[in-house]
Amino acid sequence: MRLYELSFAQIEDFFYKLAEVKDIIKDSGLMEFLPELKKLDSTIQTGTTRVKHAFPIFQKGGVVMDITNVQQAQIAEEAGAVAVMVLDKLPYDVRKSGGVARMADPKIIGEVMNSITIPVMAKVRIGHYYEAKLLEALGVDMIDESEVLTPADEEHHINKWEFSVPFVNGARNLGEALRRTVEGASMIRTKGEAGTGNVSEAVKHMKIINSEIRSLISMSEEDRVKKAREYQVPYQLVELTAKIKRLPIVNFAAGGIATPADAALMMWLGADGLFVGSGIFKSQDPDERAKAVVLAAACWEYPEIVLEAQKMISEQKSMMGIDIKSLKPEELLQVRGL
């Protein structure tokens, strides 16, 4: 059976069961006595393509929170975040401070890794191969090649196939999402407009991606070939996307999510999970807001629970948002890395 004949849910279920079996074998002590299993365990650690694409599946339905220090990382873990993303500055502060935004201090990333048990991700500049190599050597669980940081290469993204660690990339539309997939990304996130506390761009980008996938489904083979040329991706990837009626890799929402209602909205629109940046730790109630956003993301199908999550926070303590229309074209982060 070919991969594209399986549903995304079947693939997801397979990886969950595979992880459960591996844990049972390790807990039983059989790994030491069965050389082939031990060899398999060692192979799994090297970051094969299957493992890199499976890792984001385990984050589905959850919230990844941007943090800058150990204290924030611990708040995120306590709130139920599935992972943290380490930055030097939160996106709101990156936007306000200007200058060149780079990878976070490896010492801080290491301290965060040693202080929590959930996965730790970190951002690199678009096209900055060596920042990514440093994070791989450091042992982070995932790398975000992010438009929030100042691009190192205005023309090209990193070739992610050369790495053992999975990557996440931003996208505003289906063409961008599929190009990043061809480059080796294991996860896509809507770009939105980071650091604004304004979810409108994330909504727009998610709707564009969904709409373009629906268009693919109804297209003739000839039109899909033309679309593959337009997107600059292999036809087989376009065909696969139409076949499974979604992106072939996990698609999270990001950019401007600041409240439990925002979180539930993006999940309702079809996001597999969420990245929440400045919305948590630029608010005046980060502990409560972190828990509320996680609850809303997990229970988005139940408005009464999302309502309780919304009651956990105070709108008066939300971060000061930025109207997208007030930003100059050169101030938009989403246009970086097409």
Swiss-Prot record:
Keyword Lyase: yes
Source organism superkingdom: Archaea
Keywords linked to the UniProt accession: Lyase, Pyridoxal phosphate, Schiff base
Database matches in SUPFAM superfamilies: Ribulose-phoshate binding barrel
Catalyzed reactions per annotation: aldehydo-D-ribose 5-phosphate + D-glyceraldehyde 3-phosphate + L-glutamine = pyridoxal 5'-phosphate + L-glutamate + phosphate + 3 H2O + H(+)
Positions with a binding annotation for D-ribose 5-phosphate: D66, G195, G256, G277, S278
Active site location: K123 (schiff-base intermediate with d-ribose 5-phosphate)
InterPro entries: Aldolase_TIM (IPR013785), PdxS/SNZ (IPR001852), PdxS/SNZ_N (IPR033755), RibuloseP-bd_barrel (IPR011060)
Pathways involved: Cofactor biosynthesis; pyridoxal 5'-phosphate biosynthesis
Subunit details: In the presence of PdxT, forms a dodecamer of heterodimers.
Family classification: Belongs to the PdxS/SNZ family.
Descriptive protein name: Pyridoxal 5'-phosphate synthase subunit PdxS
Gene source species: Saccharolobus islandicus (strain Y.N.15.51 / Yellowstone #2)
Native organism taxonomy: Archaea, Thermoproteota, Thermoprotei, Sulfolobales, Sulfolobaceae
